[in-house]
């Protein structure tokens, strides 16, 4: 029975998540404020910033050097083309459009940034205005407050 209890405990810790965007990496900085902190995670040559509560930082044991996964829902990802400036979002990653799945109202745009594939759900109208196409350079844009951390 003891082995069964260990397996049950392990299974309760393994979770699946529907969010499409997962950036696995190492925490390189934790900047704590009064209520929230900004956690910076290095994945490939990029760094993603996540604003999370101090309570979450403590509960997850987030410290510099810890391996974590930063997560963002596809609906929280914006897409830009050309030079991105004058925007408050902290996370901007240049990549290449590798696939567009067009729907009647929304499009799912897949953008490859180094070895990480990002999915963004944007309006079909926006995809058309941006003239997105496979092979075109585009930027993934994510607010730090839209990034979750899994540890």
Regions found by a protein language model. Give the residues of each.
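Intrinsic disorder/low-complexity detector
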Residues: 7, 31-33, 112
């Amino acid at each position: 029975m003891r082995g069964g209890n260990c397996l049950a405990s392990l299974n309760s810790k393994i979770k699946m998540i529907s969010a499409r965007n997962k950036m696995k990496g190492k925490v390189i900085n934790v900047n704590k404020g009064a209520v929230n902190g900004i956690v910076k995670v290095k994945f490939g040559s990029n760094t993603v910033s996540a604003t999370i509560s101090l309570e979450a930082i403590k509960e997850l044991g987030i410290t510099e050097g810890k391996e974590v996964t930063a997560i963002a829902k596809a609906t929280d990802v914006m897409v830009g083309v050309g030079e991105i400036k004058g925007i408050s979002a902290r996370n901007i990653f240049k990549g290449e459009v590798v696939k567009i799945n067009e729907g009647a109202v929304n499009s799912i745009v897949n953008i490859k940034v180094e070895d990480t594939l990002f999915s963004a759900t944007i309006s079909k109208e926006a995809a058309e205005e941006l003239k997105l196409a496979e092979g075109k350079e585009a930027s993934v844009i994510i607010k730090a407050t839209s990034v979750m951390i899994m540890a």
